[in-house]
Every structure is written in C-alpha cells, then in structure tokens.
Amino acid sequence: MERNQRKTLVGRVVSDKMDKTITVIVETKRNHPVYGKRINYSKKYKAHDEKNLAKEGDIVRIMETRPLSATKRFRLVEIVEEAVII
C-alpha cells in the first residue's frame, strides 16, 4: 500500500504521558440509520510520536502504519494546531 492511500485521521491529543506515544481522540458525526439524527461518535487511537513533540490539547494528523506495538497502529504526521496554554 502506498503512503498516499493510507488512512489519515485528525484528532485531539488527550494524553502525552507515555514516552514516544500519544493518545488521540477522533470525533466523527454520523446519521442514525433509522431516525436520521446526527450522532457524535468518538474513538481513541494510540500513535507513535518519535520526538515527543505533541502536547495535550494539540490538534494533530495521524497516519496508519505497520504495527509498532500491541496497541499502536498509527504515527504522528503533523501538528495541525497547538493548544493554547493559559
């Protein structure tokens, strides 16, 4: 599979406590099959962050890759928007 055909997702970093690993929550909206109401869905992914660049609250883009551990199947591509620290 070529790199441009791999899944890419955009989500928010909810945890950066592990070394070289971030937890990203990806939120999507889908229509209910019967009632048609828009429902929010969310799913958490663990992603590889080689240089520990992403911090909690950042909006990041992750890409599917080969299995890096028992739970990691994605890697950090870029930080789309950095979190505002107050």
From Swiss-Prot:
Keyword rRNA-binding in annotation? yes
Q: Which InterPro entries match?
A: NA-bd_OB-fold, Ribosomal_uS17, Ribosomal_uS17_bact/chlr, Ribosomal_uS17_CS
For this protein, the record's PROSITE patterns field holds:
RIBOSOMAL_S17
- Give the UniProt keywords, A-Z: Ribonucleoprotein, Ribosomal protein, RNA-binding, rRNA-binding
Q: Which Gene3D superfamilies match?
A: Nucleic acid-binding proteins (2.40.50.140)
Any one Gene Ontology cellular component term annotated for this protein: cytosolic small ribosomal subunit
Q: Which residues form a coiled coil?
A: none
MF-aspect GO terms:
rRNA binding; structural constituent of ribosome
Task: Extract one GO BP annotation from the record.
Answer: translation
NCBIfam families according to UniProt: PRK05610.1, uS17_bact
What family name appears in the similarity comment?
Belongs to the universal ribosomal protein uS17 family.
User: What is the role of the protein in this entry?
Assistant: One of the primary rRNA binding proteins, it binds specifically to the 5'-end of 16S ribosomal RNA.
According to the record's subunit comment, the protein's assembly and interactions are: Part of the 30S ribosomal subunit.
Q: By what name is this protein known? A: Small ribosomal subunit protein uS17
